[in-house]
Amino acid sequence: MNFTKSLLVLSIGVAMVGCGSDSDDIIVPDMTLRIAHVNDTHSNFDPVKSSFTMGADGKKVYNEFGGYPRLLKAADDIKAGAKADKEPLLFLHGGDAWQGTAYFKLNEGAANADLLSQMGLDAMVLGNHEFDLDTDKLASFINTVSFPVLANNMDASKDQYLSNVDNLYPYQLFAFEGSEKRAITSVSDASDDEKVVAVIGVVLGDMPTIATGTGDVTFSDQITATQATINDLKTKGVNKIIVLSHIGNAADKELAANTTGIDIIVGGHSHTLLGDFTDLDQGNNGIYAEMIPQKDKVQKTCVVQAGQYAEAIGDVDVSFDINGNLLSCVGNNTLLSNDEFYHDSHREHQMMSSDKDDVTSFIDNNDKITIKDEDIDLRTRIDATYKPALEAAYGDVVAAAPTEIGHERRPGDAGTDKHGSDVAPMIAQGMIYWANQQSVATVTGKNVQIGLVGAGGVRTDIA
């Protein structure tokens, strides 16, 4: 695909007329920046079994999306493209790297720290699931990773463990000269030839209400704290502001609309694959790179997010004028597929010859999905270091579903009906069955008739 070339040309074209401007005057950008981003990867080191449809003909294809080695290869390809174009780049993680698979249960964040450190990330914001254990485990994770961890509306000074970490910051400054990049601690560290960009971390202000391991950490209002941080950065001479958030797409828009000075919000938490993926039967969850008017109604903030489970990567080009105002913000999410395709959910009937060629041709002509190889070194590291314990923990397969039982967190996603997940009701029914067993009912003295389960706690299809 020629996505990289078309993305750059379109971005420059928009920058020349100005973003949200009524003027036809040519505005020469002071700086362009490319951002690759992921979020809510949830320990999906291996690919996720999935499916998509081939446009109007509705032919269903069973495949795999993502996994850390495929995600790394995609990120490296984006970095190589930016370097070839002499374009500065940041690679950002929107939080919730923890939980999701048995890899996390077996390693409690240690494997996540190891593998994320191989990714070449520039920064990560804390998600709510990073607080699922205790702050001791989180402190170990933060001290181990090779990139800064961010949260500006959080005070860890009274926590026994997090108060001592030296890799947790409210924001991180980056100095760019052409495509060359370095992290700096103060604006004064930048030379006259370098452009300074701030990445501010924003976490949930109500974190203790949904996370169990917050310790003695306190959290403050997302909007108030972030505006104060922006104002402080502005007084120091920083006028190019990126927010790396884990508060959800709706809250990202609210943050953009109630502050001034944010150029782009790179989000997470709501698992929102922004963009129109209806031709792939993956739903339409809103505009990628949507422009939200800021509180002053003069400038706009661009909002992006890249789905879930390391299945996709976001790639966006932004440009700024000399005052740090956003001129353009153009890009999209791309689903990362393997190159083995099947006719059935059990992966027993592989597509060969012309069938596979048809799928490959469809993908090559669709900028929302791509076939991507895995990074060999990272795959080897996972298979040698972490997979043996995972396979031993899972044991033998004891049953199989004759047909795929679908799961989506939100009704209407990926072709589901108004009721959404088919897996979640089965789990709720299983809870009723368990509660009404004689051994349990004898203790509770209850006859349970209703089972409730949050669909967000269900993570995958059954196939």
What is each PLM-predicted segment?
Residues S23-N338, G451:
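Acidic, metal/ion-coordinating pockets
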Residues R34-I35, N39-K49, K83-L90, W98-K105, ...:
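Solvent-exposed loop/linker segments at secondary-structure transitions
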